[in-house]
Amino acid sequence: MENLKIIVINLKRRTDRREIMEKKFQDENITQYEFFEAFDGETLRPEDPILGVFKHGVHGLSRKGVAGCALSHYTVWQKIAADTSGTKYLVLEDDINFKPNFKENLSKVMKTIEPSQAMILIGMTVNGDDVTKTRDIYELDTSYTIHPLGRDYYAGGLFGYILDYRAAQYFVDYISYNGIRIVIDYLTYRSGFPMYESHPHLVYTQSVQHDGEHVDSDIQHQYDRIKYAIIPNTYEFDDYVFIPNKDSAGGDIREVCADIPILKNIADKDINCVAFNTYGWVKNNIKPLHQLIDIGNRYYESDGIYIKKNYLLKEKIIINSLNL
């Protein structure tokens, strides 16, 4: 399997899983692979800067295991995005199982990949009611070919996939603008990036495909939650005026799940943007200053709105207290 690197996401404390994966590779006569140290949700603390990517996230992302899983894939993508050589990567979670003749069948799949196919699932969770009806394509098919992702059947899962730097960079950029608001497998699914799947599937996991028995999963059975800290706002910019605990209703271009430096970078690049607030909204218009509304401190010790100075000067909005 030339031009393919294998990465296994593994928690440092789960040496048992590492050993099991090593045995699976040995059984398949696979000698070239590396383990990538996963983010351990147990060790995440409210003040960790990396948690900024979850701002505005759905409730489930406060679970430590889910957050750790998302961060693990995100950091793997950052690593892969830096490799522009054209090498493809197979990313595996450490609780997967290989289907029979995995190495041989993976080689068959690799030979059918088209240059445009940059993100390919070789296993996924299928909606329960669809398991039987999809058996012919996901279990019994022997074509070992690539097809557009069956979105009608997809119920999640990033436990085994092939990608290259193009897909990795897309997801990294997507997160830099939007943050991680939903669980990581659905983020890729909803991001708009073209996704594909192998027929048949080559890997599966018991963590979601089981008949009710207990399974060893650091995500499914980890319910402790992260309490996100309100962090200081020490950001001052020469080309923006910050008005604490105020916002302008309406005039929104889009919501961006990001911290202040990234929000500013986005605002700087958008000629239509005149302001952004620390809740994550980039704006193309603001109300007169006397009509600004009050907002509380949700993410920072001092939330508020940053307004471009050149906009204030252009509109001849001059307030002595803002030192314009």
Swiss-Prot record:
EC numbers for this chain: 2.-.-.-
MF-aspect GO terms: glycosyltransferase activity
Superkingdom to which the source organism belongs: Viruses
Top-level EC class as recorded in UniProt: transferase
Pfam families in UniProt: Glyco_transf_25 (PF01755)
Signal peptide span: none
Protein name, entry field: Putative glycosyltransferase R655
Source species of the chain: Acanthamoeba polyphaga mimivirus (APMV)
Taxonomic placement: Viruses, Varidnaviria, Bamfordvirae, Nucleocytoviricota, Megaviricetes
